Each structure stands twice: as structure tokens, then as C-alpha cells.
Amino acid sequence: MSDKPPYRKILLIKLGALGDILRSLPAMHAVHHHAPDAQIDLLTREPFIGFCRTIPWLNHVNPATTYRPWQISKWLDFARDMRSRNYDLVIDMQCKPRTIFYHLLFGLGTAWSGDSIFCQYKRPRRTKPVRQHPNELLRQQWKNLGIPFDVPADLDWLSEAPPINPLPARYVVLVC
């Protein structure tokens, strides 16, 4: 991508747990900082929709599907819906088999960054050491897209973000 990205509609895919979403906030901010006028949407799991809607760099948050493999008509409806949104670029931040399958559903005509063999912008594979930090992989993926990852993200909005709903009656918070 050049200094002025040609992408007007960008979809980020992040289906992991809450910690994965929090850890990827700097990457989401980098996309917004690089393309401030673009519509940036997120595809994520249902439990995190409410929280993700408070992320100031996102325009829309869409729920990811959890259909069974044999529910072909539902998968096709999902694919039709996502294709109708006409994204210029999809950035697969998850790079798991499920999101690689999404690439086939969305159609190969959309610019895609991720791990699918058909990607225009391949995400680097894990190198030695194998336990490479996920943010380092995102940093390399963003470099391939021409998106600077060195702008600090303002996270003050987190102090006012609503809790993840519904919280179970009993839960544990681990802070490292």
C-alpha cells in the first residue's frame, strides 16, 4: 500500500478470545491511523460484539458465524451478505483454518491479507523461535501491507468501555 491507501472499505477478522482482541488493539489503531477516512469493520465472535462496538477506530462490528459444515444454505447466505458489503481489503488477523475458509466464501476477487494460499498480501509464517509473539506476526503482516505499526494507540477509551456481557456469575481475571 502507498502513503494514501486506495482502500475505502476494510474488514478486519479477529475471532479469538478477549485477550486476543485486546492484544490486537494497536494493530487496529494502526489501520485507522494509516487510512483515517476508510470504513473499518470488524468480524468477531458474538460474546465480544458489545465491547468491540466501543472501539473508536471501527465503524461496524459484525458477528462471525458458527454454522455446522452441513448447513450449506446458511454458509451461502453468510457469504452473500459479506460479499454484498463490497470490502476493498480484508485483513485476516486470525489466520486459522476457519478464516482461511472465509476467504473462499468471500470470493477471491477481494484483496486479502492472511494465510490463505490465494492472498495478495501473505502473512508471514511463524519463524524460529516457534513461540513468536502474535503481535510480532501482526507487525510483519502490517509491514507487508505498508501500514506503519509504530504509532502508539490511545487506549483511554477503555476506562469507559462497558463490560463484556453477559458475564458469568463466576469468572477469573488473569493479569500478567
What annotation goes with each model-predicted range?
Residues 1-176:
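Catalytic machinery of carbohydrate-active enzymes
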